[in-house]
């Protein structure tokens, strides 16, 4: 019966007895690979205090073979000559396999925690260990995973060796490149010193002249990026104002399109106060969800109208700028007003220099228009 083993029963087992001893155990250079990814233990936690006694991964073996142990892997890193401890990692092995293949179930070994499913056979399994060319499996359990355990993904000894070798090769290549770059820098510094000395003497090398010509050619060939919005194939209500006259896309100012003075209409988004004015306009979501919408048929199209009401701070400078743009097309521009003032002062000076004309010959021409005083006002064009 001893060779056939007995079935595991945790019924009378104390939860604190977990098969751990104070002995250091034996070191094995070539540790067999686990079938599963490891668990990284939270810093400061004790694996044997948190690990459930039936904490056997799912996916390999039959009901009788759900028995084994978790084996600790201590890790550290050298930082400035000092050894810095890293969180422990624990790997699972089935009974009769792994670094403690000869150990019996519940033998007290340092860095070993025994686990088994109720009803598993207490005898070595024949499952073996993972081959070096096979990928480790993800950990899956029937019960809840303790919060101190982090289940790693695709972490195995062969992968670790590969990464270590890769880092070593990368480090060697980096050092080689570093030495090569250092030598190149020395050569470049000598070359630069010679070129600087020649430049002081007024001597320019062919290489310097080629560089100068190349840079000039690059500057001449460089093209200014076109930032003009692509409005040609868009509906009017989907177009975006660019730099320049906006009447091409939105039409002349009228009672139905009454925003913008002559400067804003002529320059579009490049107008001086355009960014400030745009900040006073409602967002798309505000218009969409905060407006009153109506629609009606208009030939083969649908005419959509919305009414949106919102409030701007009365004393804010941006509000004043914004209000000045409403119906501005119907008001004289500041430029025209200034032209009228200058023209009026000029005519007054001319009249004072002329001879006095008898009162009977004076006629009232105050309402006569001068072509320099005429202000062009956009009208609705259909």
Curated annotation (Swiss-Prot):
<keyword id="KW-0805">Transcription regulation</keyword>
<feature type="modified residue" description="Phosphoserine; by host">
    <location>
        <position position="9"/>
    </location>
</feature>
<feature type="modified residue" description="Phosphoserine; by host">
    <location>
        <position position="256"/>
    </location>
</feature>
<dbReference type="GO" id="GO:0044177">
    <property type="term" value="C:host cell Golgi apparatus"/>
</dbReference>
<dbReference type="GO" id="GO:1990904">
    <property type="term" value="C:ribonucleoprotein complex"/>
</dbReference>
<feature type="domain" description="CoV N NTD">
    <location>
        <begin position="31"/>
        <end position="153"/>
    </location>
</feature>
<dbReference type="GO" id="GO:0003723">
    <property type="term" value="F:RNA binding"/>
</dbReference>
<dbReference type="InterPro" id="IPR042548">
    <property type="entry name" value="NCAP_aCoV"/>
</dbReference>
<keyword id="KW-0694">RNA-binding</keyword>
<keyword id="KW-0804">Transcription</keyword>
<protein>
    <recommendedName>
        <fullName>Nucleoprotein</fullName>
    </recommendedName>
</protein>
<keyword id="KW-0597">Phosphoprotein</keyword>
<keyword id="KW-0013">ADP-ribosylation</keyword>
<feature type="region of interest" description="RNA-binding">
    <location>
        <begin position="33"/>
        <end position="159"/>
    </location>
</feature>
<dbReference type="InterPro" id="IPR001218">
    <property type="entry name" value="Nucleocap_CoV"/>
</dbReference>
<dbReference type="InterPro" id="IPR044345">
    <property type="entry name" value="N_prot_N_CoV"/>
</dbReference>
<keyword id="KW-0946">Virion</keyword>
<dbReference type="InterPro" id="IPR037195">
    <property type="entry name" value="Nucleocapsid_N"/>
</dbReference>
<dbReference type="Pfam" id="PF00937">
    <property type="entry name" value="CoV_nucleocap"/>
</dbReference>
<keyword id="KW-0687">Ribonucleoprotein</keyword>
<dbReference type="GO" id="GO:0044172">
    <property type="term" value="C:host cell endoplasmic reticulum-Golgi intermediate compartment"/>
</dbReference>
<feature type="region of interest" description="Disordered">
    <location>
        <begin position="150"/>
        <end position="190"/>
    </location>
</feature>
<comment type="function">
    <text>Packages the positive strand viral genome RNA into a helical ribonucleocapsid (RNP) and plays a fundamental role during virion assembly through its interactions with the viral genome and membrane protein M. Plays an important role in enhancing the efficiency of subgenomic viral RNA transcription as well as viral replication.</text>
</comment>
<feature type="region of interest" description="Dimerization">
    <location>
        <begin position="231"/>
        <end position="334"/>
    </location>
</feature>
<dbReference type="InterPro" id="IPR044344">
    <property type="entry name" value="N_prot_C_CoV"/>
</dbReference>
<comment type="subunit">
    <text>Homooligomer. Both monomeric and oligomeric forms interact with RNA. Interacts with protein M. Interacts with NSP3; this interaction serves to tether the genome to the newly translated replicase-transcriptase complex at a very early stage of infection.</text>
</comment>
<dbReference type="InterPro" id="IPR037179">
    <property type="entry name" value="Nucleocapsid_C"/>
</dbReference>
<feature type="region of interest" description="Disordered">
    <location>
        <begin position="1"/>
        <end position="24"/>
    </location>
</feature>
<feature type="modified residue" description="Phosphoserine; by host">
    <location>
        <position position="254"/>
    </location>
</feature>
<feature type="compositionally biased region" description="Basic and acidic residues">
    <location>
        <begin position="215"/>
        <end position="235"/>
    </location>
</feature>
<feature type="compositionally biased region" description="Basic residues">
    <location>
        <begin position="164"/>
        <end position="176"/>
    </location>
</feature>
<feature type="region of interest" description="Disordered">
    <location>
        <begin position="334"/>
        <end position="362"/>
    </location>
</feature>
<comment type="similarity">
    <text>Belongs to the alphacoronavirus nucleocapsid protein family.</text>
</comment>
<keyword id="KW-1040">Host Golgi apparatus</keyword>
<feature type="domain" description="CoV N CTD">
    <location>
        <begin position="224"/>
        <end position="337"/>
    </location>
</feature>
<feature type="modified residue" description="Phosphoserine; by host">
    <location>
        <position position="156"/>
    </location>
</feature>
<feature type="region of interest" description="Disordered">
    <location>
        <begin position="202"/>
        <end position="240"/>
    </location>
</feature>
<keyword id="KW-0543">Viral nucleoprotein</keyword>
<dbReference type="GO" id="GO:0019013">
    <property type="term" value="C:viral nucleocapsid"/>
</dbReference>
<feature type="compositionally biased region" description="Low complexity">
    <location>
        <begin position="154"/>
        <end position="163"/>
    </location>
</feature>
